[in-house]
Amino acid sequence: MTLHITDFRDGFPMGTTRITDENDADNNVPITLEVVKLAAGESVAITAANETAWLLMNGAASGTVGGTEFSFERSSLFDESSSCFHVSAGTNIQFQCSIDTEFTVYSCNNTKSFEARVFSPADVANEPRGKGQVNDRCLRYVRTIFDGSNSDPNTELVLGEVITFQGAWSSYPPHHHAQPEIYHYRFTEPQGYGHGELGETVLKVRNFDTVKILDLNDHAQCAAPGYGMYYSWVIRHLPDDRYTVPEFTEEHAWIMDPESKYWDPEV
């Protein structure tokens, strides 16, 4: 499967759409990504087969996961923080949607047990990353839902969201890491677009696109002026190398120093 998946630019149908499969033969990122769209009144009652995270994109749902109750509602990816639940294989998931609802669902083949977690917007900060760097040209909001700092050692996924301001950069300075990753994109307008780097390759990304990130490639991003850019990001830990922080490309890391000198127009 290609690294840049553009098959769904017209949107997703009701039901379940698989975008990536952890067993893909080509350009394999060992994470399955699906979009699940449910109608008002529709319910879900399943037992998770693998480690799985359900991230609410829009809509409203309430129920229980592993005996823990939740009630989610979201109308804006850009102005509201994350609602998500993260479960291990064998966990019972039951909920009902009060309005049309959409989730992105991330899973991987991991049968190790851990306690089900529910994350509400109050649990997930809008971190203003890049604040004070190069006149705030790469200021963005990073929402880390769960990573090694707040999840069980038996987990294998890391999940978060990034809000890129219109005309600005994110995932900057360019950075890379050994662990495979997936970005899934949405924009404030249907015609919105941005650019995503994969090493020396630059991709034009649009609404509903997905990009696989492999091979220690740098993956800085930018949004076209006028269009806010959202992407979810999901990483899978490696067996002997759990993800902690990215490695910034040395030649561009100087911009992280708030005292760094850079050109700005005088008039």
Question: Model features per residue range: what roles?
Answer:
Residues 1-44, 51-60, 255-257, 261-267:
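Hydrophobic, proline/glycine-rich low-complexity stretches
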Residues 85-89, 96, 102-174:
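Non-heme Fe(II) oxygenase catalytic core, chiefly the N-lobe of the double-stranded beta-helix
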Residues 25, 32-96:
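Extended, compositionally biased flexible segments
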Residues 48-69, 166-167, 172, 178-210, ...:
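Glycine- and acidic-residue-biased ligand/ion/polar-headgroup-sensing regions
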Residues 33-37, 53, 84-86, 105, ...:
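Conserved hydrophobic/aromatic beta-strand scaffold that supports enzyme active sites
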Residues 78-98, 108, 205-226, 232-236:
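Conserved metal-binding segment of the jelly-roll/cupin
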Residues 101-142, 197, 232-267:
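Double-stranded beta-helix
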